[in-house]
Amino acid sequence: TKHDMFECLCANQSKTLVAIRKYLVNVGECEESFDVCFRLLTIKECVQRIARFLRVNPTEETELAYYTSLQTFSYMLPFKAEKGMEGKLSVMNIAYMNDPNEGRTLQKSLFAGEIPFEGDIRHRKDARYPYVFIKCFTPQIDFLPMWEMYGDYARGCCLVLDWSRIRTQKMEVPLYHVCYLSSDVEDFHVEQQFNANLTSYKEMEEELHELAALCDLLYRKNDAACLEAMHSILNEILYLFKDSSYAYEKEVRICYQYPGVDEAFRHTSGEFCKLYVATDFPVAIKEVILGPKFLNRSE
């Protein structure tokens, strides 16, 4: 019966159902909540399919790098690394991402240009950020636009990872392609020219349009509890989409997500602490490339 389903979902402690369980606890048992719950479960399934589309399984031939400042790189080294961080990457919370459109691109596509998860623009912006942690990589190695944007204005370094050594540890890395969305007056698109790494860009576009239709049905209910649950479910993929103007980056991301405060959370030292987690695997670096404007390069 529906009552049994309600009791079962409320009692289920699976982390994947946290958002739906919280919604049911908030609104209680009624015909409307069962309908919303079914649609939220359908959205969850669609989100999981999209995440699988974007998943990267690196091979020994995979060449990915990330650009950083020399100071940040130094914190990975034994003489400066915090306890337990030797040879590991710091994966920062999305609150510190330098692109103001992070998480917005997919929202605009799904909700006809609106950004519902940031609240009413007439009121103060909600400063709370989800427990989503991102590390960005690219196959664009020693590439000038990447140096200027992410390599401390070409004064930093480009770290090329050795995936053959990482793979020998047989640990699952939550690595995803970024999907680049283009748009016209009427709709959004997943174009092959911007997404050469996707196995089926057409299938991805179809999944996104199905997701948009599902989200629209719930968004029109104008229900705060429903919107919160939908936001929590969509967080799994919100930060895996960017505007097609960034397609030259060919970005790949490690993405860790947590439903709440977790013992894995760390804070940087200093006056203004920043929230991060460590990769659950040690990183093997194949090559360190110094930027074209690296100070004292000849030394």
What are these regions, as identified by a protein language model?
Residues K2-E299:
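Partner-binding and oligomerization surfaces adjacent to conserved cores of proteins
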